[in-house]
Swiss-Prot record:
Protein purpose: tRNA nucleus export receptor which facilitates tRNA translocation across the nuclear pore complex. Involved in pre-tRNA splicing, probably by affecting the interaction of pre-tRNA with splicing endonuclease.
Cellular localisation: Nucleus; Cytoplasm
Main location: nucleus
Lineage start: Eukaryota, Fungi, Dikarya, Ascomycota, Pezizomycotina
Similarity-based family: Belongs to the exportin family.
GO CC, any one term: cytoplasm
UniProt name for this protein: Exportin-T
InterPro entries membership: ARM-like, ARM-type_fold, Exportin-1/Importin-b-like, Exportin-T_C, XPOT
Keyword Isomerase recorded: no
Top-level taxonomic group: Eukaryota
Organism for this UniProt entry: Coccidioides immitis (strain RS) (Valley fever fungus)
Amino acid sequence: MEEQVANAIEIAGNPSSDQTIKAQAFDYLNQLRADPSGWQVCLSLFTKTPRRSDVVRHVALEIINSATQTGLVDIQGLSFIKDNLLTYLQQMYGPDGAAQSDPSNIQNKIAQTITYLFSALYATEWNTFFDDILRLTYNGPDSGVRDNTLGIIFYLRVINSIHDEIGDVLVSRSRAEQDRANILKDLIRERDVQKLVTSWQDILSQWQERNDLIAEMCLRAIGSWVSWINISLVVNQTMLDLLFRQLARVKDVDLHQGGEKVRDAAIDVFTEIVGKKMKPADKIDMIVYLNLESIVAQLTASPPLHEHRFTSKYDTDLAETVTKLVNITTVDIVKALDSEDADNATKEKAEALLQAFLPHILRYFSDEYDEICSTAIPCVNELLSYLRKVAKRNPAIIPQQSAMLLPILKAIIQKMRYDETSSWGTEDDQMDEMEFQDLRKRLNVLQQIIASTNEQLYMDAVSEVVRATFHNVRQSGGQIDWRDLDLALHEMFLFGELAVRCGGLYTKNKPNNPASERLIEMMLMMVESDIRSFRHPATQLQFMEICVRYSSFFEHHARFIPGVLEGFLQLAHHQMTKVKVRSWYLFHRLVKHLRNYIGNVAQTVIAALGDLLTINAEVPVEGPDGDDMSSEDHEGSADALFNNQLYLFEAIGTICSTSSVPLDKQVVYAQSIMNPIFIDMERNLGAAKSHDERALLQIHHDIMALGTLAKGFSDWIPGTSSPAVPPAPEISEAFGQVAEATLVALESLKFSFSIRTAARAAFSRLIGVRGSHNLPQLPRWIDGLLTQTSSKDEMALFLRLLDQVIFGFKTEIYGILDTLLTPFLQRVFAGISEPTTGTDDEIQLAELKREYLNFLLMILNNDLGTVIISTTNQPIFETVITTIEHFAKDVDDFPTAKMAFLVLSRMSNLWGGPDVVQPSNPANGTTPSQSALPGFTQFMITRFSPLCWALPMNPSFNPKDAQAKQVLGEAAALQKIIYLKTGPEYVRWLRETELPGMGMGPDLVNEYVGSLEMLDIKGFRQFFQAFIQRFSA
């Protein structure tokens, strides 16, 4: 069997193995892994001589580890594995160890196995665990020193592995696993920790100059274990002398890599010591005792960090290691200052330490390497948050804080600057750019803390940077480093978080606050410096972003608008795709904000952007991994370019429809954009009918562009009280061509999902520009948009659009709605009745049900309810009621059931006639209604009332569920409405038929009917919810 297992492992691990045989090998090994006795053959495979291949032995150990972890091995089996592995360790790592040791990956895997055995056996069966492993560190039983290299390295691997298993706080553990880990740590502290610490001291003192790997591993062990053992075991003179000796390596300018790792590991030990949980007073005393400020000062002054700074020899690993120590120490100092448990003496010491550490904080926070700066951000955040807290408590102290805040703020601003090596916008620079922008966001958090602590200090510092930069731009004729200009613009952009936080730059034509006033000054300097002509793409983008963000500035300084518009139109043709595409979006945003201030520039804009309005659809190309390479996720892809090109169409629509442009010119300009698109649609229609993919996509793009142009022309939303006014009849007529062209394409190409999608978007946008002129075409829109192949999602989206139409044109739509309601609802019913084929389909079905019910509510709430019961639509009325009844009983979809009851309540209010019972609380009564629909009162009693019980009587119904309670509340409201409409007739039905039919006795019936009669709707909702809980119990 051993050979069989070994062969399976070899096949599974061989990249050139036949895939079928490889799959069989994996299946076999997985069966072996699950077999309670599978570990036995693996143990033999691992320990047997001659040694098997490394891959066989590695996988064999993995299977053993899996068995020990998952409980497949009993105590006897674990002891058997332990004995065999101890024998193996003695042979391989003991005094008479093999000439050729195991490779590192095998050693780590054995250490892991030994760790799992420790976890299982140390508490009860193997209390000599550490003695047995420590025995490997000697070359013989009589040896007085730990002189066995192989054994020492393996022992330290086990020590570090045990910490990972039971002591590492970053490892996620279940409650049971954490409890077991805590028990093991307690046992170690009780039994063996002293001998372990002594062994580390022995190893470090004997091997620190002889073997860097051993020294580093030993220091890593000390650093990790110190977090959960008694601090005095490490913070004592013997251990500290050993640690200081390793720190002295920092003076060695020719230190090799192994020595550097030892040095860094020694610093990490101090970081772990400081990170240990203690009372504030004890922590501050320990920081003083360790003389950490002096240690950091010496490390900072060392050649790798001082002399070699700003050179290629600068040791960034050492700098980051020291920064971690500075960071954790500063955090604890600040915590002591902020602690209510710390006495005055402790706080005085902490204050002195903070002043001493501030130069170190600034040194590493302002380091030119972003990784080092990032490591210091947590402590700077803690410090600034503390200073803000103190300032809010005692504003008089703010001036005193300036000495500390200003250098930190200057460091933040300087770190916001691109470094000298950055090459913005290149393909290779994308990851660095993302990381730098992330750093900027984190730095801005710190900057905003300072702004909220000392607003004046922040405003002065940023203003000075911006002022000096724009002065240099003017003095040098634009010949300054793009990084400096980008920094000033970036700070201007961020300044808005303070300047416009209360609604905008201006209030009643005056600056909103002092920060707004400063920002307006900066904006004046920016536009007067003519930085739009500065050619670096980063600053060009920043310029546009700022103009859009602070567009209200131009409302009060309209003289600058022509120049800014000219700059945007130039950048719309930028050679770099990133800038060009972004400029299209920002241009759209700018003209939307400044619509009333732009003036009659439509002809100029159309001429300038005309070459960018040519639509050229590209069929997505599938990449080698099957992904769509033209998706929106790829900057510069065909999809992304077109989606941004749409912003140009909307922007042109906005500019052409301003009040400054004569109406006849508006029509001319609109047609100048539309006509080429109509020609293009006609040219591609034949190929599209033949399902040509590119032609279909071209027409999709054409329709989207026309719809977006319409959106730009009109902000008007029918049925709302928005300040926008309906467009002039001439404009509506012009866009009638768009509606007709879209419908012609839709009627020919309704088999295409993308065409339907584009047409639906166009229909939505044409509502605002065409108004009620769209209504006669509604049957054609429905016929094209709701086809046999339309998805539930499409139906739901179109229902939402129809809601918009009904709301906007409630007084004009009745006749059309009466004609199209039956065929339209039949299509919706077909979609609802289709079987679902997966989770996504179920989600779409639920959405369609809710949109259908919302559509009915929209009709009922806008005085169009009679259309449902008109002569034309009478045949479908029963189906409408049946679907609502079905939804009201759906225990798996409470939101839909709730809406179903809302619809039934609204119908009852409208068609149930006037109230025959005066409500106990008129405010909670029903709304005035028309005369009763013949036969509807009986219909409510016999059809609607039983529905209120159908859902709660379902065995799966949980009346305590929050959503279920909401459904019960609506069911109660429906019963109350039926009672108000029918009075004694409903009471008699409940007493004689409905309630007894559910098994209720006279007392329950009396209680129920009495509550229905006496309580208002709100009270009865609460009663019904509680009653169902009692009745279901």
